[in-house]
Structures are given as C-alpha cells and as structure tokens.
Amino acid sequence: MSGQNNVVGVHYKVGRRIGEGSFGVIFEGTNLLNNQQVAIKFEPRRSDAPQLRDEYRTYKLLAGCTGIPNVYYFGQEGLHNILVIDLLGPSLEDLLDLCGRKFSVKTVAMAAKQMLARVQSIHEKSLVYRDIKPDNFLIGRPNSKNANMIYVVDFGMVKFYRDPVTKQHIPYREKKNLSGTARYMSINTHLGREQSRRDDLEALGHVFMYFLRGSLPWQGLKAATNKQKYERIGEKKQSTPLRELCAGFPEEFYKYMHYARNLAFDATPDYDYLQGLFSKVLERLNTTEDENFDWNLLNNGKGWQSLKSRNAETENQRSSKPPAPKLESKSPALQNHASTQNVVSKRSDYEKPFAEPHLNSASDSAEPNQNSLPNPPTETKATTTVPDRSGLATNQPAPVDVHDSSEERVTREQVQNATKETEAPKKKKSFWASILSCCSGSNEDT
C-alpha cells in the first residue's frame, strides 16, 4: 500500500496519537481486514534501549491469560519497530484524576482483586513484572464486554525469576541498580536487592495505598541529584510505620502490606490468602464485586466516558479524514505513557527475558529507502526525566545496571515449549513516510 495511506504491517492503518513513553509513541489504529481498533506502538530501531521485540515475546508467552491484551503483529517499518496490540481504555492513573485523586475503599478492593490476579498470572509464567504502577493498568474499551476488566500492559521491564522449565529460582543478589518506578517500588529494591515475586506484591500494596490516600508519604521529596532523591524515597519508606501508612483504612490493607514485606526472597506467595483479604473488605462493606467502580458512577451514573464525550467529539471532527499523525497532537483521554517515569529505562541483554545477540547483518543495518522516508526522525540518546509537582525536573542519561554481567539468564530456547515465534519478516522498504521523532524520557514525579 502507498505511504500516503499511513498503513503499516500490511493492513494496519495509523490514526491519532494516544500516548508516549521512553520507548517511543503509541497511535490508535485500525485493522483494515476487519475494522478492529488497535493500538500501534513505535520505537526507533536504533534506540539505546529497544524493548518492543522482547515485549512482543512476553505477550505471546502470556497469551490466553485474563487481562492480558492480545498481540497481533511485530515488525519493522522504515526506521522503527512496531507492535500492534488491543486498543484499551484509560489507565487507573487517568481515572484517578477524573475521580478527584482518590478512590473509595470499595473501588480499591475490587481493583486490587483484579490487579493481584494479573500479577499472579505473570508470576505463574515464571516472570516478575518489576514496574508496578497505576499507569500500566488499563480498563477495557467503553461499551465493550470487558469494559470493567483491568488489563496490565507494558512489559519492558519483565524478567524471569526462575527457569520456566526446571522452575529453579534465580539466586539472591545484592548491589543491584534500581529498576522500576521509585514511588511504588519495594524497600528491597531501594536497597539494591534482586527482585522477585515479593517485590511485585509490595509495589502493588503501595499502589493500593496511593489510591486510598491520594498520595504517599514519600512523594514530593527533593534532592540535588536523582540518586539522592531515590535514596531519600527509600529511607522514607523504611521509616514510615505500616500502621501509619494504612491508618484510617480497613485492617486488611495493613495485613496485605505486612505479608508482602515479610515474604522470603524465593517464597511462593499465598495469592488466595491475599485475595481473601480484599473479599473480606467487600463483605464488611456489605457489597460484592458488582463492577460499580467510582469512575462508572461519575456524572450521575453516566460514567467516565461521558466526561470525555465533548473532547471525543472534537477529536472525531478533527480526525474524520485523518492526516498523517503528528507528534504535537495529544489525546486528552489516554496519557498513561506520558505520565510514567522509570528509574531505569535501559537494560543490558542479561536483564532481558528473551535476550539475543543484536543483529549486525547488512539487512538489519541498511538504511531504508529514502524515497519512502522523506523525513527520517532524529535519533537521540535516551534520558530519564524526573519532575515533581513543584516543577522541579532534571534530565540525566538513563543508568545501566552493571552489576549482573555474570548472571546466568534464561534463554529464548528454554521457553519454546511455552510459545512459538510468529514474528513478521523484515521489510526492505517502508510502506509510508516516517512520522515519528525518537522520544526519550518520561515524566512521572516520584
């Protein structure tokens, strides 16, 4: 198809931009074969921290798990890698904004049960997520059968905590660089300890308390450097008693946090016990999982989407005949990737669950047809942006974990029984003119 039609991956038409992150940009798209709406993620092929190939393989490994988006395509278009997945609704962070920066106990308990189930599914596939945050949990599309299902997305930081075949757990290690989002990461992660299932659970607990309280005690801390800021956040987490953190809320949230923080490094969590805690919260409220989340009760019961209808109408008018997407256009509804900040956005091969040697063949390094790419993007090195609500923001090159060069990682061959590769072959020419600039950094305050 011609470049003027904005078609990638043979039959995916690119629409408006709906988000961005340290990897690149996300666009809404349409499968021209069945008119299905999809999300199309772009990242520069020569990025310092390419992740879409690994993310594709993770989606394939998790295929069939409840609350995991379907993945449809991975391939290359000109100067970019692209990944096509299900188009979903807004993130829990977006919905928190709409609900006045706090959720009710009922909503948090219902959301917690779903979020915990998603993390359990990831753990059962021998993976740890390592970047738990509200921005990475999205609800389904409005008016769909799964509109109230909570999905987990963005698997750029996942890692095997055990061999998927032998089930042997990775060894305990220290002196690890931080990986994840400082606001929510576990205390052990701050202390440089290898992450395992317990750390995902503790980070989830921090998210639950963030939803209930509206903020966490370690937000808004200032320091001269990012490193010092992360240290201050870790110190504040350690010095804040759990009773104080959970004060004013049902006892079950304290029990959850106490359980997560006292798990052994290689212990298998009792997910049923944790699910039972939130079931007890709902029982005490004399309610059930009726899917009446706070965001569905907005605007006299019309729901969150009614608050966006005016903006959506404007967007539809602008995109009735969509031109080539432009980076400066923004979606008012889906900014989940624009509001996230990972402490580590670049990983060495041994930190990647499906690591393989970088391709150096002529076909991989060859420049695409410049006739089809009149405006190639400018390549820039990845940086990490750490703003806070006071307006302070600092940029610095994203740190690289250098402490695990001898770590034995799980290879791609070890999971061939779990998933089969169906990646699209590389194309020598792009179907359309490149419309992206290399995005670097993101902007979650810690």
Curated annotation (Swiss-Prot):
Presence of keyword Nucleotide-binding: yes
EC code(s) of this entry: 2.7.11.1
InterPro entries in the cross-refs: CK1_Ser-Thr_kinase (IPR050235), Kinase-like_dom_sf (IPR011009), Prot_kinase_dom (IPR000719), Protein_kinase_ATP_BS (IPR017441), Ser/Thr_kinase_AS (IPR008271)
GO annotation (BP), single: regulation of endocytosis
Basic and acidic residues compositional bias, start-end: 346-355, 401-412
Stretches assigned to the Protein kinase domain: 12-274
Coiled coil: none
Amino-acid positions noted as binding ATP in the UniProt annotation, renumbered to this chain: I18, G19, E20, G21, S22, F23, G24, V25, I26, K41
Active site: D131
Biased composition (Polar residues): 332-345, 360-397
Keywords carried by this UniProt record: ATP-binding, Cytoplasm, Kinase, Nucleotide-binding, Phosphoprotein, Serine/threonine-protein kinase, Transferase
SUPFAM superfamilies, per the entry: Protein kinase-like (PK-like)
Class of enzymatic activity (EC top level): transferase
GO cellular component, one term: fungal-type vacuole
Catalytic activity: L-seryl-[protein] + ATP = O-phospho-L-seryl-[protein] + ADP + H(+); L-threonyl-[protein] + ATP = O-phospho-L-threonyl-[protein] + ADP + H(+)
Region described as Disordered: spans on this chain: 308-430
Main location: cytoplasm
Subcellular location: Cytoplasm
Keyword rRNA-binding: no
Gene3D superfamilies recorded: Transferase(Phosphotransferase) domain 1
Protein name: Casein kinase I homolog 1
Lineage summary: Eukaryota, Fungi, Dikarya, Ascomycota, Taphrinomycotina
